[in-house]
Regions:
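Phosphate-sensing "switch" segment of ASCE/P-loop ATPases
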Residues: 1-69
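C-terminal engagement/docking regions of AAA+ P-loop ATPases
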Residues: 63-76, 86-138
Length: 138
């Protein structure tokens, strides 16, 4: 993941970081309740991972995307499927959708691409492009 590209998000990150640096204890107290809420949500998601169902259409789309982006081996698909399960569990849904694949693919696949010395396009952009083509094409 990189830095946010939206100005408002960047400003918020900068403000929070500055707030932490000026007074770490107050900052930690301020965010403690939110941290606990997120922690509970993560624990709940971890406990429901086995309930996430991956049907053949999702498996097929993941394989299609991995082939299209040139991901080496099968680890791309396996990583993408694990991430889809985690996303669904965190969002309290039981079946991943094509939109879930669109959200998560760039994070799981961009570092798995073979390098093309003649293509200066970033791997993130290449993955996004292929995912959008394949999902929008259905």
């Amino acid at each position: 993941m990189g830095s946010p590209s939206e100005i408002s998000q960047r400003i918020e990150v900068i403000k929070r970081r500055d707030e932490f640096e000026r007074d770490p204890l107050t900052f930690l107290r301020k965010w403690r309740r939110k941290d606990i809420t997120v922690q509970k949500k993560i624990i709940h998601a971890k406990n429901t991972l086995d309930n996430i169902q991956l049907d053949d259409s999702i498996l097929s789309k993941c394989a299609e995307i991995c082939i299209a982006v040139g991901s080496d081996g099968l680890r791309g698909e396996l990583t993408l499927l694990r991430a889809l399960r985690a996303l669904c569990a965190f969002n309290e849904t039981t079946k991943p959708t094509l939109e879930d694949i669109r959200k998560i693919a760039v994070y799981t696949l961009s570092h798995r691409l073979r390098r093309d010395p003649l293509d200066d396009t970033s791997s993130e952009v290449r993955v996004k492009r292929k995912v959008n083509e394949l999902i929008d094409d259905k």
